[in-house]
Protein backbone atom coordinates (compact mmCIF):
# COMPACT_ATOMS: atom_id res chain seq x y z
CA UNK A 1 0.00 0.00 0.00
CA UNK A 2 1.29 3.44 -0.93
CA UNK A 3 1.17 6.03 1.86
CA UNK A 4 -0.94 9.05 0.93
CA UNK A 5 -3.19 7.17 -1.48
CA UNK A 6 -6.84 7.42 -0.57
CA UNK A 7 -10.32 7.59 -2.00
CA UNK A 8 -13.12 9.64 -0.47
CA UNK A 9 -16.67 8.32 -0.59
CA UNK A 10 -19.75 10.08 0.74
CA UNK A 11 -23.35 8.95 1.01
CA UNK A 12 -26.49 10.93 1.62
CA UNK A 13 -30.20 10.26 2.06
CA UNK A 14 -31.67 13.07 -0.06
CA UNK A 15 -35.38 12.39 0.69
CA UNK A 16 -36.39 13.17 -2.90
CA UNK A 17 -34.84 15.20 -5.71
CA UNK A 18 -37.88 16.23 -7.72
CA UNK A 19 -37.59 19.93 -6.81
CA UNK A 20 -35.08 21.82 -9.02
CA UNK A 21 -33.72 23.98 -6.18
CA UNK A 22 -32.97 20.87 -4.11
CA UNK A 23 -31.06 19.29 -7.02
CA UNK A 24 -29.09 22.52 -7.49
CA UNK A 25 -28.20 22.70 -3.76
CA UNK A 26 -27.18 19.04 -3.83
CA UNK A 27 -24.91 19.59 -6.86
CA UNK A 28 -23.22 22.52 -5.09
CA UNK A 29 -22.82 20.47 -1.90
CA UNK A 30 -21.24 17.55 -3.77
CA UNK A 31 -18.78 19.88 -5.52
CA UNK A 32 -17.89 21.51 -2.18
CA UNK A 33 -17.27 18.14 -0.47
CA UNK A 34 -15.16 17.05 -3.48
CA UNK A 35 -15.39 13.25 -3.01
CA UNK A 36 -14.42 10.69 -5.62
CA UNK A 37 -17.65 8.70 -5.24
CA UNK A 38 -21.05 9.83 -4.00
CA UNK A 39 -23.97 7.55 -3.12
CA UNK A 40 -27.52 8.89 -2.93
CA UNK A 41 -30.53 7.19 -1.36
CA UNK A 42 -34.24 8.01 -1.68
CA UNK A 43 -33.91 10.02 -4.90
CA UNK A 44 -37.61 9.39 -5.66
CA UNK A 45 -36.91 9.52 -9.40
CA UNK A 46 -38.86 7.51 -11.92
CA UNK A 47 -36.82 6.03 -14.80
CA UNK A 48 -37.77 8.91 -17.11
CA UNK A 49 -36.56 11.52 -14.55
CA UNK A 50 -32.92 10.48 -14.21
CA UNK A 51 -31.65 13.05 -16.72
CA UNK A 52 -32.49 15.74 -14.14
CA UNK A 53 -29.55 14.88 -11.88
CA UNK A 54 -26.47 16.66 -13.21
CA UNK A 55 -23.31 17.71 -11.40
CA UNK A 56 -20.47 19.51 -13.18
CA UNK A 57 -17.41 17.24 -13.22
CA UNK A 58 -19.50 14.08 -12.74
CA UNK A 59 -20.43 12.41 -16.03
CA UNK A 60 -20.69 8.88 -14.64
CA UNK A 61 -24.06 8.76 -12.86
CA UNK A 62 -25.79 5.42 -12.35
CA UNK A 63 -29.41 5.11 -11.18
CA UNK A 64 -31.78 2.42 -9.96
CA UNK A 65 -35.39 3.56 -9.82
CA UNK A 66 -38.83 2.05 -9.44
CA UNK A 67 -41.90 3.00 -11.45
CA UNK A 68 -43.32 5.11 -8.62
CA UNK A 69 -41.91 8.27 -7.06
CA UNK A 70 -40.37 6.50 -4.08
CA UNK A 71 -37.15 4.68 -3.29
CA UNK A 72 -34.42 5.29 -5.88
CA UNK A 73 -30.66 5.25 -5.49
CA UNK A 74 -27.77 6.71 -7.45
CA UNK A 75 -24.01 6.38 -7.52
CA UNK A 76 -21.97 9.26 -8.93
CA UNK A 77 -18.32 8.78 -9.87
CA UNK A 78 -16.15 11.86 -10.29
CA UNK A 79 -14.42 12.59 -13.58
CA UNK A 80 -11.19 12.80 -11.49
CA UNK A 81 -11.18 8.98 -11.33
CA UNK A 82 -10.07 6.92 -14.28
CA UNK A 83 -12.39 3.97 -13.77
CA UNK A 84 -13.39 1.08 -15.96
CA UNK A 85 -16.95 -0.10 -15.32
CA UNK A 86 -17.42 -3.81 -15.98
CA UNK A 87 -20.95 -4.45 -14.75
CA UNK A 88 -23.91 -2.55 -13.32
CA UNK A 89 -26.70 -4.42 -11.52
CA UNK A 90 -29.89 -2.52 -10.71
CA UNK A 91 -32.86 -3.46 -8.56
CA UNK A 92 -36.12 -2.99 -10.51
CA UNK A 93 -37.75 -1.43 -7.43
CA UNK A 94 -34.94 1.10 -6.94
CA UNK A 95 -33.63 -0.20 -3.63
CA UNK A 96 -30.04 -0.91 -4.63
CA UNK A 97 -27.45 -0.62 -7.37
CA UNK A 98 -24.14 -2.47 -7.61
CA UNK A 99 -21.24 -1.36 -9.78
CA UNK A 100 -18.30 -3.61 -10.50
CA UNK A 101 -15.17 -2.18 -12.05
CA UNK A 102 -11.61 -1.08 -11.48
CA UNK A 103 -9.91 2.18 -10.56
Regions inferred by a protein language model and the residue ranges of each:
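Short phosphate/oxyanion-binding micro-motifs
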Residues: 1-103
